[in-house]
Amino acid sequence: MNESFDKDFSNHTPMMQQYLKLKAQHPEILLFYRMGDFYELFYDDAKRASQLLDISLTKRGASAGEPIPMAGIPHHAVENYLAKLVNQGESVAICEQIGDPATSKGPVERKVVRIVTPGTISDEALLQERQDNLLAAIWQDGKGYGYATLDISSGRFRLSEPADRETMAAELQRTNPAELLYAEDFAEMALIEGRRGLRRRPLWEFEIDTARQQLNLQFGTRDLVGFGVENASRGLCAAGCLLQYVKDTQRTSLPHIRSITMERQQDSIIMDAATRRNLEITQNLAGGVENTLAAVLDCTVTPMGSRMLKRWLHMPVRNTNILRERQQTIGALQDTVSELQPVLRQVGDLERILARLALRTARPRDLARMRHAFQQLPELHAQLETVDSAPVQALRKKMGDFAELRDLLERAIIDAPPVLVRDGGVIAPGYHEELDEWRALADGATDYLDRLEIRERERTGLDTLKVGYNAVHGYYIQISRGQSHLAPINYVRRQTLKNAERYIIPELKEYEDKVLTSKGKALALEKQLYDELFDLLLPHLADLQQSANALAELDVLVNLAERAWTLNYTCPTFTDKPGIRITEGRHPVVEQVLNEPFIANPLNLSPQRRMLIITGPNMGGKSTYMRQTALIALLAYIGSYVPAQNVEIGPIDRIFTRVGAADDLASGRSTFMVEMTETANILHNATENSLVLMDEIGRGTSTYDGLSLAWACAENLANKIKALTLFATHYFELTQLPEKMEGVANVHLDALEHGDTIAFMHSVQDGAASKSYGLAVAALAGVPKEVIKRARQKLRELESISPNAAATQVDGTQMSLLAAPEETSPAVEALENLDPDSLTPRQALEWIYRLKSLV
């Protein structure tokens, strides 16, 4: 059956009518329909779930004359199945029984109590603990884009207004949302197609007036001026849709979402999608996390610290006051790393626990972990009290103390609580007198049954008599079959077994009712007390969130202090003068994976030396040298120490990389097209304060075309844009650029060749390389010897041609490839319009004289 929810359900059974009405409210997502100890799925949902979860597809009777496809999962294992579905981009509506089966006439009342989507999950079983899980919304109008992100597991709410497609693509790549909401008339589908968790939303959800109203209601404000977003209309359209979606799916208040922040381009160093990919900040080129900058730098001891560090890496700040404060804190903490990290490790993921507290989905073990985090605060305060640093003391103040809340949780929650409050045994003995009384009554059953058994044996003289309990029949007195005929007259038969009879007596029945009542009342009271704990904790939510943020930042800074000490990093100096000066710089990732010592190299970029033409052999280290420069700059601008002996760095507004490329087959773009698209982005957007890495521009086309393009790009970057540029090339003709342009210098990475072997020195030297060593590298790669021999012969032939001919052509006539088309001469235009077959001999002679006059 294809589900169609606009028709009459009357020919279905009452239970299926209830299901179909609920399903009609959530037609596009899976519905988990609670039936006893299982969540059931029916019809198309069952078919989809059986494929996605690899569970059995069965049939359940018939409704409306048709068998019903059905699949089910045990309720106690639901989180595991939800995790699988969420990881595949699916959303699920959870439908629970809310009525009492004992009093219900017809199907038990049910309703959808929550909707689980990839971008709105907060349960720790469904989340990657060291990675942000973002819900995002995108909006577009004629002036640009609006973009909003929310991490519901922390309450972090951000918006931005990317001006163009490239900036928007970079934001999507940086934030990598788990779920992306877009308007039904969104024009740039090519920008988002293929992304996970795409959700098409109606236009009215993006209306600006509705958005302002929603946000003011959420924050309890009259306007949004205090958040600095009042005039960000495109961003607010996206934020309004996002907030509406969260309210629709969570179906509860969201007290932990207390503010919204505008992210402005001018506040951070801008990196486009290609740059983030090429620098392998948190993901390597193969899509993994090994051998990335984060893999080397992230030794944080809390999940929330790890997530904050990754946010810093993807959004380096330009405010040098913030950066110097971080540097000072790192320096001040270096002597206390070994004492602080073990204590911080015990804090855990307080940030996400607080989000679950706000959503009222926190479990008993969440509260136990919160208590454990509070118990670490006195030790952290004591250790930080002696650190002579204003930023450290500011962090210490934000951490707070929460002694009263710690005392509350120590009194209220047992040391090792069960997973769920419905299991009972969560509230500690002594916390509530009435609960202790009900528990004592329930727990005293064993003593009573022992006494009853002894008394009845003595009274009846039956030595096989014993008292017991099972979940189906309750309490009973059991007598063997051989003695059952001696049972007293007041014994009422309850159950017959193969070798025994079971009885009940009024006294035991009365006690059974009392015990079962006490257990039920104890569980109900325990649930009530647990809910009251939320009411006692939530008024402190704002201070608790501030504390969690301070603890995460402390973890990041202590981690950076440890990394600086362990990896021999130095504190960079910021200057207002443009340029980058590095002494003995190292690649932070490559030096960790090498078995031999890394060869450190210097770098000097300044207004007088703003472009380096880098030549040298393949595998000589050109790309490593370029990337290490960008990574050192990136680390400096998150406030970290850097892998070098000394670094002085001026203002940087953007980092661009045009390093390596691959075919973009999905978009129908060749390697060369990808390369040129990235190059065009750099030439349009780079400024004199940008750091630009250009590697092997011009590959993938003919030699002269490639050389001409490389020459023109270098010329544009050096003379017009004046960006700080590292330009690696195998076109040796480009080494003549320093003679023709100011601010350009040659450097090279050397190698030693001996016979058929080659040794790479990996050391950067001034001047151009003497040769490429391409044949030696080919031999090293295992190219057959006869091919290498023939290549040497051909090389000698080509080298017999004047080596400067190509450069002369590129500098002169060949550059016309990139110049504007020349105007067509009048003589040529006249000839193009001439029809020679229609001319008489006299007219032909006249045309000769006319053309002569036009030349």
From Swiss-Prot:
GO molecular function: ATP binding; ATP-dependent DNA damage sensor activity; damaged DNA binding; mismatched DNA binding
Entries under InterPro entries matching the protein: DNA_mismatch_repair_MutS, DNA_mismatch_repair_MutS-lik_N, DNA_mismatch_repair_MutS/MSH, DNA_mismatch_repair_MutS_C, DNA_mismatch_repair_MutS_clamp, DNA_mismatch_repair_MutS_core, DNA_mismatch_repair_MutS_N, DNA_mismatch_repair_MutS_sf
GO biological process: mismatch repair
Keyword Disulfide bond in annotation: no
Family annotation (PROSITE patterns): DNA_MISMATCH_REPAIR_2
Any Pfam family: MutS_I
Keywords: ATP-binding, DNA damage, DNA repair, DNA-binding, Nucleotide-binding
Binding sites annotated in the UniProt record for ATP: G616, P617, N618, M619, G620, G621, K622, S623
Gene Ontology CC annotation, any one: cytosol
Coiled coil: none
NCBIfam families: mutS1, PRK05399.1
HAMAP family listed in its UniProt record: MutS
Function: This protein is involved in the repair of mismatches in DNA. It is possible that it carries out the mismatch recognition step. This protein has a weak ATPase activity.
Membership in a protein family: Belongs to the DNA mismatch repair MutS family.
PANTHER family listed in its UniProt record: DNA MISMATCH REPAIR PROTEIN MSH1, MITOCHONDRIAL (PTHR11361:SF34), DNA MISMATCH REPAIR PROTEIN MUTS FAMILY MEMBER (PTHR11361)
Record protein name field: DNA mismatch repair protein MutS
Species of origin: Salmonella newport (strain SL254)
Gene: mutS
